[in-house]
Amino acid sequence: MCGMEYRLKKGSVYEGKVEKVDFPNKATVWVTDEDGQKEKAIVKNAIPGQTVRFCVNKKRKGHCEGRLMEVVEKSPLQTNPACPHFGKCGGCTYQTVAYKEQLKIKSTQVEKLLSEVVSGELPFEGIIGSPVTEEYRNKMEFSFGDEYKDGPLALGLHKRNSMYDIVPVTECKIIDEDYRKILTCVQNYAIEKELPFQHKLSHEGYLRHLLVRKSVKTGQILVDIVTTTQIEHDFTELVNRLTSIEYKGTLTGVLHTFNDSLADAVINEKTELLYGQDYIEEELLGLRFKITPFSFFQTNSLGAEVLYSKAREYVLSGGFGDVAGSKPVIYDLYTGTGTIAQMLSPVASKVIGVEIVAEAVEAAKKNAAQNGLTNCEFIADDVLKALDNIEIKPDFILLDPPRDGIHPKALEKIIDYGVDRMVYISCKPTSLARDLVTLQERGYKVEKCCCVDMFPGTVHVESVVLMQYCGK
């Protein structure tokens, strides 16, 4: 095998068929060498059944890793892409795969990952699809840059495998017409005014990102132009252009955020309100939520209703153990803007949400008040620190951490509460699998689990796990 004999040479190009694709989008490609021996390579961004050409760029124990160069033969699963940006843009790897097959791929990936770490037979309930497969995004972060080195200004998404080149995505299929109009308007304005974009290597330039949020239920739209402070510019004319566009929804706010950080991310160092209000409102499962530019909120609103309904079902299944007959105290850790906390409010005596982003916590408090909920408390702090200071103990814990999962020390503190049951929502199955190992070692058993597709066309998927404490 490659990891022992290194038959496949680094820098050389090979051709092979994709046998399977594991999360996160790692395809197993088998290559027959000149001696007739089969060797394995891992190649990203491929689809089961494709014949691909790739260049070996890394060697690992037991296999090589390669960079996809060309699809020599399509997979039987593939159709023609609906989006003209497919292949250039870095997203929507599975767009050419029928949605039913996408769900099979994702479900198989999650089931395989969890089966490898869960003790006994995996109680896997399969996957639930998104109610919509196109125009489902309620938030987009576009980047300013150029399509090629020293080219004209472009506004869009990063080209696949590139941190520098930008693909204009005016016909993107996961955003609706209003996003496309805003994207075109802002790009044309920037070109006309000859505003320079910030170069990622030199960190010189002005324009960095365009953030757009749009509510599915209310149709409210929020636009945020993110720049450095290297130039002073009056955006009044751009605001006038944006407000004169005929939208399906309603433009309720335009913001200008200043960000001089070196990181290639939208970071709020200072924000000015140029027009309207600095938030939009979305409705989920009968509750209304204010969403600010930088607060976390699931990017597929209709999919979020499916995800949270399943999480709530898991929370309510089996009662609340020792607190049966009375309402439990529920911890919602990594609560974001408090969406799940508020959905659990009717069945709890108290819900305590913890979130490190202060802006999100303020939004959560306002949302709870707006929804008439008096038993929700939200704390702005890191979970690891906050757990030392909360006096009231939980009867049930809900976990919805960021992609990298739960800090090991925080996970130990969570386990030490000894609650009868927990629900873990994860947007990265590999992180979930790692944390489940620790949870099982400390006495928890997976009662049931499933996944929910929130991101059609992409490689991403959400997972939900219900755990029961069974003792060490």
What are these model-derived regions, one by one?
Residues C2-K10, E15, K20-A27, Q230-K472:
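Rossmann-like S-adenosyl-L-methionine
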Residues V212, T218-T228, R288-T292:
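Short, aliphatic-rich beta-strand segments
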Residues E70-P81, G90-P196, K217:
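Extended interfacial segments that mediate partner engagement and assembly in macromolecular machines
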Residues A27-D33, G156-K159, D224-V226, A364:
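Short, acidic/hydrophobic/Gly-rich beta-strand patch recurrent on exposed beta strands
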